[in-house]
């Protein structure tokens, strides 16, 4: 089960410097790790927490942030696994720099990103500014759970974050 509860304060950076263009993400493809999944919009809850997507085989895009390919950090989250087994972002931590990520958008275009790095952060030390903070260029952040699984609380202790830049 993915717990994205550490993603506090996201409302502070909504659509910073970005205008909605009608290019909402519809699908994300990462051939290297066999991801080809729909994207649903996500909004933060009353506590400022970005919830996980409704399904284990789909992903969710932070709707109040930039659209993938627009200025700023677009954020897409997905589950790592479920009680039944691997989920959409099960192999996300296996990515390395230089991998292509394709985001199909509602306007018919595809934003292509290249991974820069993959990091793992404890949920109690999640780098909110590095993930959601205002930046001058179009970038993408992919988030899932990782690290040790706490069986008592039924949650992972870490988040895996992929940082990617728009391919030029």
Which sequence ranges carry the predicted segments?
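Solvent-exposed, non-transmembrane regions of membrane-associated and secreted proteins
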Residues: 5-112, 116-168
């Amino acid at each position: 089960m993915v717990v994205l509860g550490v993603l506090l304060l996201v409302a502070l950076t909504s659509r910073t410097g970005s205008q909605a263009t009608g290019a909402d993400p519809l699908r994300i493809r990462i051939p290297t790790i066999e991801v080809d999944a729909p994207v649903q919009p996500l909004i933060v809850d009353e506590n400022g927490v970005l919830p996980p997507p409704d399904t284990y085989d789909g992903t969710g895009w932070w709707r109040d942030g930039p659209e993938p390919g627009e200025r700023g950090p677009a954020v897409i989250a997905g589950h790592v696994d479920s009680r039944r087994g691997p989920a959409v972002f099960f192999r996300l931590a296996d990515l390395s720099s230089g991998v292509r990520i394709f985001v199909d958008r509602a306007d018919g275009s595809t934003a292509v990103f290249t991974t820069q790095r993959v990091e793992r952060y404890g949920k109690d030390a999640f780098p909110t500014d590095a993930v959601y903070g205002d930046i001058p260029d179009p970038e993408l952040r992919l988030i899932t759970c990782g690290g040790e699984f706490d069986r008592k609380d039924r949650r992972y202790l870490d988040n895996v974050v992929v940082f990617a830049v728009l391919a030029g």
